[in-house]
Amino acid sequence: MTNYFNSLSLRDQLAQLGTCRFMELDEFSNEVAVLKDKKIVIVGCGAQGLNQGLNMRDSGLDISYALREGAIKEKRQSWKNATENNFNVGTYEELIPKADLVINLTPDKQHTSVIKAIQPHIKKDAVLSYSHGFNIVEEGTKIREDITVIMVAPKCPGTEVREEYKRGFGVPTLIAVHPENDPHGIGLDWAKAYAYATGGHRAGVLESSFVAEVKSDLMGEQTMLCGVLQTGSILTFDKMVADGVEPNYAAKLIQYGWETITEALKHGGITNMMDRLSNPAKLRANEIAEELKEKMRPLFQKHMDDIISGEFSSRMMRDWANDDKELLTWRAETENTAFEKTEATSEEIKEQEYFDKGVLMVAFVRAGVELAFETMVEAGIIEESAYYESLHETPLIANTIARKKLYEMNRVISDTAEYGCYLFDHAAKPLVKDYVNSLEPEVAGKKFGTDCNGVDNQKLIHVNDDLRSHPVEKVGARLRTAMTAMKKIYA
C-alpha cells in the first residue's frame, strides 16, 4: 500500500514510531496566549468537534464552525449541535478564508474529500490541525507547503473530552507537528496552546509524531479499548445467563461493571484493580488472564502487523468503497446480541460487588491491557504512548458503555475505531468462547471463594510481584504522578 508511512525509509519509520516525550507542566506556562485573538474554525460538529469547541471557547478562544452548505440548509445534526450551543456557523467559503487555525474534526472516512474541498480556501501561512493522523499517514494526503500542519489528539471519545474538562481535569493528549509542513517553526507552540485549551495539560501531554499516534491509536482502540471490552461483554453475559444468573442482573453487572473496575485501574493501574479482589479471587483472575493472553496473543500480533504494514487501512478503505458493508453487518450483529437487548435491573449493585462477582471481567481487563501494551512496545512504540493507548483510556471508553452499552461506545468512537473493534471482536470471540464457557460459574455473576479464603502465601507473593513488575505498571506509576487533578468517574 502506498502512503506516507510506507514512503519513508526503515530508519525514518522507526524514528517516527519511536517519537514520544512526556511534556512537563511548565511547558504550558504560556497557556493559550498564541491563540488569543486568532480566528479558529472547526470543520465538522460531531462528538469531537462540538466538545473540543466547547472546551476551547470556555478557555477564552474565538470558535466558529464551518459546515457543508447542505448540512446548513437541511439543518442536520452538526448544524443543530453548533447552533444550539450558540456558535457562529457558516459555509467553507464564508469562514475558512478568514481562519488562522482550521481544525478538521470530521469523521476519518470524510477527510480526503473534506481536505480537497477546504484546502483552496485556507489562507497563506495558516495552520491546519487534525485530531487523528490517518489522512496524512495512511491515505498519504499532501498539504500545501505554506500551511503548518499539527495534530492535537485527545485519547478518548469526544463526549469524555467535555466531561473530564467539566470535572476540572482533562484527558491525556498527543500532540505532533507534521515534519513535511512546519515552514515557520510555529507548529509546536500552536499545538501546545490548543492542547491547553481542551484541558489536556492537566492529564498529561505527549509530544509525539503523526506516525506514532496513528499506529498506536489504531492498535489500542481495536484491541483493548474497544475490542476486548466488546468481546468480554458479549461472552461474559452469555456465560452468566447459561450458568443461571438472572439476565437483567447480568446485564447491569457488565454494563456498569467495566466502568467501576477500570476506575480502580485508572487510579492505581492493574495492581490496584487486582488488589480489589479477595486473595483467592486474585489468584484465579491471574490464572484466567494468563490463559487469555496465551490464546489472544497471536490475534493481537496480527492486528499490530496489519496496522504497521497498512493492510488494515487498505481493508477498511475497501469497505468504505463498498458502502460500509462489513461495518454495517457487524454493527447489526452487535445490536442483536443478547447483552445489548437485555435491560439492566433496577436492583442496586454496590461498588465492591462488581469486583466480587466480576473475576472474569477483571481478568479480561488485565489480559487486554498487558497484551496491547506488550505488542505495541514490541513494534517500536514508546512505552508512554503504549500506556495511554492500552490502560489510561480504558476507563473513558468503559464510561460510554455505562451510558448505553456497546451501542454508545461504538456511536461515539471514531469510524476507524468502530470498524477495528468489530474486526477484532469477529475474530476474538471464536478464539476464547469455549475457554470462557468452560470456566466455573463463580468467576462471573457469583461471589468467588465463599467456601474458603485461604491461599498459598508464596504463590500470592509471586503473583503480586509479577503484577507490580510489569512494564505497564512501572511507566503508569510514573505518568500518574503528573495527574494530580484526576477526578473520579464512578460515584
Curated annotation (Swiss-Prot):
UniProt-recorded name of the protein: Ketol-acid reductoisomerase (NADP(+))
Pfam family for this entry, one: KARI_C
One GO term describing the cellular component: cytosol
Active site: residue positions: H132
GO molecular function terms attached to this record: ketol-acid reductoisomerase activity; magnesium ion binding
EC number: 1.1.1.86
The record's free-text note on cofactor binding: Binds 2 magnesium ions per subunit.
Organism, scientific name: Christiangramia forsetii (strain DSM 17595 / CGMCC 1.15422 / KT0803) (Gramella forsetii)
Cofactor: Mg(2+)
Domain KARI C-terminal knotted: 209-353, 354-486
InterPro entries in the cross-refs: 6-PGluconate_DH-like_C_sf, 6PGD_dom2, KARI, KARI_C, KARI_N, NAD(P)-bd_dom_sf
